[in-house]
Amino acid sequence: MRAWTGSWRWIMLILFAWGTLLFYIGGHLVRDNDHPDHSSRELSKILAKLERLKQQNEDLRRMAESLRIPEGPIDQGTATGRVRVLEEQLVKAKEQIENYKKQARNGLGKDHEILRRRIENGAKELWFFLQSELKKLKHLEGNELQRHADEILLDLGHHERSIMTDLYYLSQTDGAGDWREKEAKDLTELVQRRITYLQNPKDCSKARKLVCNINKGCGYGCQLHHVVYCFMIAYGTQRTLILESQNWRYATGGWETVFRPVSETCTDRSGLSTGHWSGEVNDKNIQVVELPIVDSLHPRPPYLPLAVPEDLADRLLRVHGDPAVWWVSQFVKYLIRPQPWLEKEIEEATKKLGFKHPVIGVHVRRTDKVGTEAAFHPIEEYMVHVEEHFQLLARRMQVDKKRVYLATDDPTLLKEAKTKYSNYEFISDNSISWSAGLHNRYTENSLRGVILDIHFLSQADFLVCTFSSQVCRVAYEIMQTLHPDASANFHSLDDIYYFGGQNAHNQIAVYPHKPRTEEEIPMEPGDIIGVAGNHWDGYSKGINRKLGKTGLYPSYKVREKIETVKYPTYPEAEK
C-alpha cells in the first residue's frame, strides 16, 4: 500500500504541474476545445472580426485627422510647401489603405498560422506525454519512482519552454511586435501630456489644488506609493498636485533635491479656501484640499487602483497584460524623473557594476519584513526561478553569461550566493546592502542606494522577488514603462501584485468548478471571485461573492475583471 500511496502523491504533483501549464497556455491559444459547438466558434469569429474592424476604423480616423490641411506656415510658408506636405500624407495614406486591403483579403499571415498550429500541436503532445508517463508511475515504487518523477518534471520543463517560446514568436508575427511598440509609446505619450498639462496651470493662484505630504511613517517604496495615490486622486478630481516634502526623512531639502519638481509653474499651496478631504462633490467649492493617507480616506473616490480610465481601457487591454499596473506606472514614471546629479550617478553605477543584458533581477528582503509581513525565503527558492528563466531566454537569444543583479538588505547574502552558485555572475553593491539596514535606512546615502537598486531591478529582463515588498513592486511598475508589455516578466515568491489601499481585486469565473476537497469552493461561469492570492501551484485563494464561500479554486478557470472609471480626458492637453 505504501508504494501506491507514494505513486499517487507523485501523480497528484504532476497533475498540478499540468494544470499550471494549461493556465499559461489557455490565455494564448486561439482555439477553445472545451466549446466545440458550431455556434460558439462562429460567434468567436464574428467577435474577432468586429474587434479588427473597430481597430481599423480607429486607425483610419487617426489617418483622416492627420490629413487635415495644416494650419499656419509650412516650410517657407508657400503654397508649394503645403502641396508637398499633402502629397506625402496622401502617399502614406494610400500605403496604409493597401495594408488594410491585404489584411482583409489574406487574413492572418503565414508565420502566425504556422506558429499557432505548432502551439496547438505542442499542447496535444504534452497531454499525450503526461498520460503515458502517469500510467508508468502506477507500476513504480521507491527510488525508481523518485527517479522517474524527476525525469518527468525535467521533460515537462522542456515542453513548457518550447510552447512559451512559440507564444513569444507568435506575439511578434505579422507586425504585431511593431504595432505593440508604437501603441504603447502613443499611450504613454498621451498620458504624460495629460499629466503635464494638469500639473502646470497657467495661473497657479486660481488653480484647484490637492495637497499631499510625503512624510508618511514608512520607507521609500511606501512613501512613493503614497504620493502615487495622491497623484491619482488629483488627476481624477482635476486638481494640481502640490507635494509637500520639506524635512523629508530621506532628504531634508525635499523631493526636488532628488527628482524633478512635480510642477514647473505651481508649487504654492495658497488659495482662497482650504479644507480636508470630504469627497469630490463636497469639495467642489474648496480651492485647496488636503488629502490624508489612504488608510484614513473617507469617502473613497472611484479613482483608486486597480481601476483604469474608461477612455483608454480598450486600447490598454489590447496592448498590456495588466492594465491596472500600467496605469499606476504612468504616475511613477512622471514622479521619478531624476535630477541631473542622480542621472549621472546612475550612469556611473551602471559602468562601475558592469550591468549588462541578459540579466535577471533578484530582490531579497530580510530585515523588518521577515516574521511580520513576509516569510523567510532562502536564496535557493529565488534561484530556481532564475535558472528556469535563463533556460527560456536561451531559446531565443544568446546567453553568454548568466548574470543576476542581487539587491538585498542582508550584507552576508552576496557571499553566500557566489559560493552556492559559482556558474552565475552576481552584480551587486554591498555598500547598498549595509545602508539598507534598519539603523542606516533613513539617510541620503540609503536613499541613493534604494533608488539604484530599484533602477537596476527594473532594467532586468526578468524579476524574481516577493511582492510583499514595496521596493519589488516599484521596480515592477517602472519595468512596465520600459517595454510595451512586461506584465509577465516576474515571479513573486509570495503575493500577487497589489497596491496598498486598493479597491477590491476581482476575477470572473470562465469555467465551472466542482470542489474535490473541503478546501475548494464551487464556481459557475460569471461568478465574481474576490482574489486573496495565488499559491503558484495551479490554485488561487479567494471568495465566491455570490455564495460567500472562501477557499481554493483552479487559477486557469478565471479571468481578471477590469474595473474602469470615467477619468477626465483633458482635451486641452492636445491643443
UniProtKB/Swiss-Prot annotation:
Limits of the GT23 domain: 206-493
SMART domains with a match to the protein in the record: SH3
Keywords: Disulfide bond, Glycosyltransferase, Golgi apparatus, Membrane, Phosphoprotein, SH3 domain, SH3-binding, Signal-anchor, Transferase, Transmembrane, Transmembrane helix
PTM: Tyrosine phosphorylated by PKDCC/VLK.
S-adenosyl-L-methionine recorded as keyword: no
Transmembrane region(s): 10-30
Record topology, Lumenal segments: 31-575
Motif SH3-binding location, chain numbering: 299-305
Subcellular location per the Swiss-Prot or TrEMBL entry: Golgi apparatus, Golgi stack membrane
Domain SH3 residue range list: 502-563
Enzyme Commission number(s) from the entry: 2.4.1.68
Cytoplasmic compartment segments: 1-9
Topology of the protein relative to the lipid bilayer: Single-pass type II membrane protein
Residues with Phosphoserine modification: 278
GO function terms (MF aspect): alpha-(1->6)-fucosyltransferase activity; glycoprotein 6-alpha-L-fucosyltransferase activity; glycosyltransferase activity; SH3 domain binding
Disulfide bonds: 204-266, 212-230, 218-222, 465-472
Keyword Transmembrane helix part of the UniProt annotation: yes
Known catalytic reactions: N(4)-{beta-D-GlcNAc-(1->2)-alpha-D-Man-(1->3)-[beta-D-GlcNAc-(1->2)-alpha-D-Man-(1->6)]-beta-D-Man-(1->4)-beta-D-GlcNAc-(1->4)-beta-D-GlcNAc}-L-asparaginyl-[protein] + GDP-beta-L-fucose = an N(4)-{beta-D-GlcNAc-(1->2)-alpha-D-Man-(1->3)-[beta-D-GlcNAc-(1->2)-alpha-D-Man-(1->6)]-beta-D-Man-(1->4)-beta-D-GlcNAc-(1->4)-[alpha-L-Fuc-(1->6)]-beta-D-GlcNAc}-L-asparaginyl-[protein] + GDP + H(+)
Primary localization class, coarse: Golgi
Pfam families (alphabetical): FUT8_N_cat, SH3_9
Top-rank taxon: Eukaryota
Family: Belongs to the glycosyltransferase 23 family.
Reported function: Catalyzes the addition of fucose in alpha 1-6 linkage to the first GlcNAc residue, next to the peptide chains in N-glycans.
Protein name: Alpha-(1,6)-fucosyltransferase
Designated gene of the protein: Fut8
